[in-house]
Amino acid sequence: MKILDKMFGTHSEREIKRIMPLVEQIEKLKPDMMALSDDELRGKTKEYRERLEQGTTLDELLPEAYATVREAARRVLNMEHYRVQLIGGIILHQGRIAEMKTGEGKTLVSTLPAYLNALEGKGVHVVTVNDYLAKRDAEWMGQVHEFLGLKVGVVLNSLTSEERREQYQCDITYVTNNELGFDYLRDNMVIYKEQLVLRDLHYAIIDEVDSVLIDEARTPLIISGQSGKSTKLYEACDILARQMERGEDMEDLSKMDAIMGVVQEETGDFIVNEKDKIVNLTERGVAKVEQFFHIDNLADPENLEIQHNIILALRAHNLMFRDQDYVVKDDQVLIVDEFTGRIMPGRRYSDGLHQAIEAKEHVKVKRESKTLATITFQNFFNKFGKKAGMTGTALTEEKEFRDIYGMDVVEIPTNRPIARKDLQDAVYKTKKEKLHAIVEAVVQAHAKGQPVLVGTITIEASEELSNLLRKQGIPHKVLNAKFHEMEAEIVADAGVHGAVTIATNMAGRGTDIKLDDAARSAGGLKIIGTERHESRRIDNQLRGRSGRQGDPGESKFYISLEDDLMRLFGSERMIGMFNALGIPENQEIEHKTLSNAIETAQKKIESNNFGIRKNLLEYDQVMNEQREIIYAERRRVLDGESMRDVIYKMITDIVDNTVDMVVADDADSSEWDLKELNSVLVPIIPLEPVKKDEISGMKKNSLKQLLKEKAVKLYEAKEAQFPEPEAIRELERVILLKVIDKKWMDHIDDMDQLRQGIGLQAYGQKDPLVEYKMSGYEMFDSMTANIQEDTVKLLLHVRVEQKVEREQVAKVTGTNKDDSVGKAPVKREEAKVYPNDPCPYGSGKKYKQCCGRK
């Protein structure tokens, strides 16, 4: 492959060569654009829109539109797009991923495709990873768009629905991936069309696309409501988990033992597979659980909840670690983001894992939540007509972007050559020796005034290192808490000479680290990685914090044989070999085998994580098809379409299904079980029971026809009871919405239960995914049949007394990815009306006797 690349150039080089003529065209237009007055430049927007209406395509407009934005940026921001930024802008317009190194001005690049695509008037979403960046970019880059006459909006966590709707109506909207996803889910829970906030998903430009579409894609977005379940089972399972004994992982059985047929006895009550983060009970463990709960068989369907909860308790004790995965603060368990190391208030693990950790830590166990709506980022972003992304690191995950999102990655060359030195990893035997070496390196760099950024993986590691530096008297700043506006300032100051900053993973990503002159002459920013991350991409992101725009700098990773990566994925034989060499304390080990082993371990984990995400997507695909059907049906109701034909079809379907269920095709009418037919049909459609004399000598189809005619007449009689025809049409919509929402929410829960129990199918030599699909489709069919029955039953039994109003089926209590910013308090616009005041709507009655009645 490498030889072919040398002969023909890499994929990226070939693609860039192909778009260079466009770049030349944009460059040629520069003098013309500079000659225009501000008003003439602004007038270009109107001109382009008119040309689009006359049939010109966006691709034909691209050179002029990009030249316009380039000139506007020069006038407004005093920043002019470099050639490489123009290349990036073209790649983004084509719906691809532009890999641009840190400091190459990705934010400015996005203005080009955002402007061009906004000309169509269908809206453009610029998606960022947090509220701070969304607000900063909207205020900063928004100036260019506003200068050119476009409206720019920004959606923040604190906005109300009305404010969100207004921001989404703008030509270009800056928003975080979580807010956008949750707004989509909330839009599919509203009960009036006027409550919708989003417009159609037309074009998205995703900043830090690897973070959004890959790192965060392992957890779906979930909107939850309160569940009625008790929390006692979590506490009981926690008590039992503490008494259970951990056994040896069967994976440690060598290949030779397997070939020789050596039988390894199961040990302990449960086995933990740290690589895949799975806990399994042994036979002894199953017996212990059955004895503890006084049950006969743990595998019985009615014991599924106990089985699920004991596994959760064991996971909480053996795979979830305090100060690494979560922290305990103010009697609450708060999650730590594994990618940024930030605390995330308001976010909770789903499936009851959060409750299991609360029981483990002896804090108040909160009621489990019920999922009201959910979607994965993969399925959500694939709804956009066109999407593009930019990041500093995407090539290592190109296969995933191609397979799942249909996007290829084009590496954009840097504006100036990279001057950063990436040094060989330093490997030590123990963690203690490694930390000693890191402190030494920081002390040496600090002595000559070179700024240092130390990247850690966990909060615990950053605090440990901070203590060691404090003992050495090195002044430093630590960044590991939740994102706050100070963070960007601390990160920006990390390039000042003599600065020492310790930060978890990607804290402050999106903020440039600029060097002062003294720091530049001291060798630029020195990056120290205290551990290799599971993903090479995140290591590359840390390296990329240094050496922006041709600045000097260096990066080096320090590793010990005790690190999780080496312990879990390094080969036992290699670690044993280094231990046997008797290397003296604090001696750095340099060996080609080690560097290769680290690279191999990371590739193993990356493909493992890709597998997890692909698996999640395959399972979610089943739900996605069902979600599309339900959401489309809801939208028809919201759009105010007449549901009369839908209801008539439901009535005839119920008659068909009931007759088919009770009456055999070839049975004579004298053999029909009328008692059963009436007992099934009459509770739903209140007809006169069918009598024997009505049907003598009848065929099955004639029976169906007779019942359908009676049922339709019954419904027409119900319609006649309503003085206004629109009243029954609205009643149909109210009942349909209520039934669909109730059944869909229960269905999400049922599918969740099915998913948790489906793994057991593997023991029966069945493919769990195939079984899940089959069972899922059966459950969906059953749900749609239930929707039909409940809707028809409610409509035919309803009494006309008062005007019906729509109401939401469940109250939303939270989401699993809440941003930490609180909602702004709602201010009352008009004066408060008290019960004894006259009604403000002019009825002449007191308010409490008129509109104030509940």
Each predicted region: which residue ranges?
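Conserved P-loop NTPase motor core
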Residues: 1-582, 631-632, 649, 653
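Short alpha-helical segment immediately N-terminal to, or the first helix within
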Residues: 91, 839-840
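ATP-binding Walker
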Residues: 104, 845-846
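Extended, charged helical/alpha-beta scaffold domains that provide interaction surfaces
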Residues: 326-334, 340-348, 549-550, 557, ...
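Short, Lys/Glu-rich amphipathic helical modules
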Residues: 448-462, 639-640, 692-696, 840
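Membrane-interface amphipathic helices and adjacent TM-edge segments
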Residues: 468-470, 835-838
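Processing junctions and N-termini across compartments
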Residues: 833-835, 844-845
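Cysteine-centered loop/knuckle micro-motif
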Residues: 841, 848-852
